Amino acid sequence: MNMLIGKTAIVTGASSGIGYETARLFAGEGANVIVAARRQHELDKLVAAIEWDGGKAIALAGDVRDEAYAKSLVKLAESTFGGLDIAFNNAGANGEMGPTSDVSLEGWQEALNVNLTGAFLGAKYQIPAMQRRGGGSLIFTSTFVGYTVGMPGTAAYAASKAGVIGLMKTLAAELGPQGIRVNAILPGGTATSMAEAWVDTPEKLAFVEGLHALKRRATPEEIARSVLYLASDASSFSTGSAMLVDGGVSINRT
């Protein structure tokens, strides 16, 4: 229960799903946590849950596509807790789904702006704060979709998340000499509210579960434990990794 004692973390997309469970897990391991998402009332409930469990958290609502918001999150971490050690850039959007030739420019840009530009803006301001600390851990959420398995109808989502992997690897090469590790998690199907768009019928749910060697989807808590590994000193020699936490979807062919 003390893997992150004395550390301060930012978690975006924290109002639900993987981000919510990661924020609670980080706090339970001793971190001070800045929780970020668009819905203040959801963040307030998360902070209350963390504090009930004896942890420390502060909420700041906003949009990760807003550069001023990205800067404000880091400023809050430094002014309140004295610095920034960990950032989990997890906020995401499906974007418009369907045949690529039917996808609107607006639907395409939504996925790119949230998933890729949001990750870039977060990192842009998190990096100097970690440099001031003498090191840190940057973590991004990507996906197996388009990386190991192509899925029809997911062009905007897959392309934006593939871009996150490129960003992660570039940053890992740039920042390794400064003691900043940069990695990404690639979850398989996970039972979150965002993922319900993929499994809105029993038939779709059965199909998605069947893609996995384990024949089920992950819980958000299972993915959060992998994020904790990358955030902690347990992964002190890991950087530039696209870490599959996918229940075997990338190797299953039945």
Model-derived features with residue positions:
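Substrate-binding pocket helix/loop in short-chain dehydrogenase/reductase
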Residues: 98-100, 107-112, 208
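Alpha-helical segment proximal to the catalytic Tyr-Lys
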Residues: 128, 147, 173-174, 236
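Short C-terminal tail/terminal secondary-structure segment
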Residues: 94-97, 227-228, 239-254
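Short, small/polar-rich loop/turn modules that mediate ligand/substrate recognition or access, typified
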Residues: 176, 181, 238-240
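Active-site helix of classical SDR
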Residues: 123, 160, 168
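Conserved glycine-rich cofactor-binding loop
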Residues: 8, 15-17
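The beta1-alpha1 cofactor-binding region of Rossmann-like NAD(H)/NADP(H)-dependent oxidoreductases
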Residues: 41, 61-73, 105, 221
